[in-house]
Amino acid sequence: MEFQLFLPQMRMTLATMAERVQTAVDAGFDGVALMDHLAPPMAEAQPMWDAMVAASWLGAKTTGTVGHLVLCDAFRHPAVLARQAVSLDHATDGRFELGIGWGSVPTEFPTFGVGSTEPRARVDRLTETFEVLQALWSGDIVSYEGEHHTLVDAQQAPGPEHHIPIVIGGAGPRTLDLVARFADWWNLPIHKLDQFDELREKAGNARPSLQERVTFVPEGGDRDEIIGTALRRFSDTGHAKGNAEELIEHFAARQAAGIERTYVWTSDFANPDTLQEFGETVIATLR
């Protein structure tokens, strides 16, 4: 199983983020995934860094993969996104992954005036985005006419230096169609985990992943205090809790069920000691 650190780009400086991500990579994590919002969900007044700028910074300052879980399609024109993704592919020597979806917080759209809140329109737009990305990355001259995007004799250079992995999250029928057509990784919403076997057949060849909140009890730690603090901060839904032995068992079961990657969202905001011990115990054992 691969392990990625999910680290929302808030509550800490960019320099601190780089330190924690590199600690995670040194401990065995494969890389980092950021979020993409115009205001932090349920914490709108908190400061937050831009998703693509933060990915560029971490790509330069750390050695693992960098990506997002996931970019919101409505925030960027696909021609802009195509250029950004290729630039990051070259800058990171192939360590950038393009995670993208049609938006998990629809209230952002009218607040910032970025697009329709209607699900059908958002999925249609995302479909066109993938088609435009593929066309522009080919290096050919592109003319494209869709409902949401129009290009006339457009061309971009350079193209990708490496294959840019595509990560798509979701479980709806049209989202799964996009996963089967375009994705390398399919991130299954944890509330749909009980439908995994049924849905996996519709995801094509995309490799399945899962995001989980994790509360890690280190050796010698106060279990009741650590878990109690986490449950006061966060929901118990989709929340793995325990010491190294318990979490090894938990993720081994996920692995046996067919999950190939976990995005670990630590409840202590990526405390370096937690990252190091989790890597040395849980990740090392499962590998």
Identify the residue ranges that each predicted region occupies.
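Active-site-adjacent structural elements that line small-molecule/cofactor binding pockets in enzymes
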Residues: 1-287
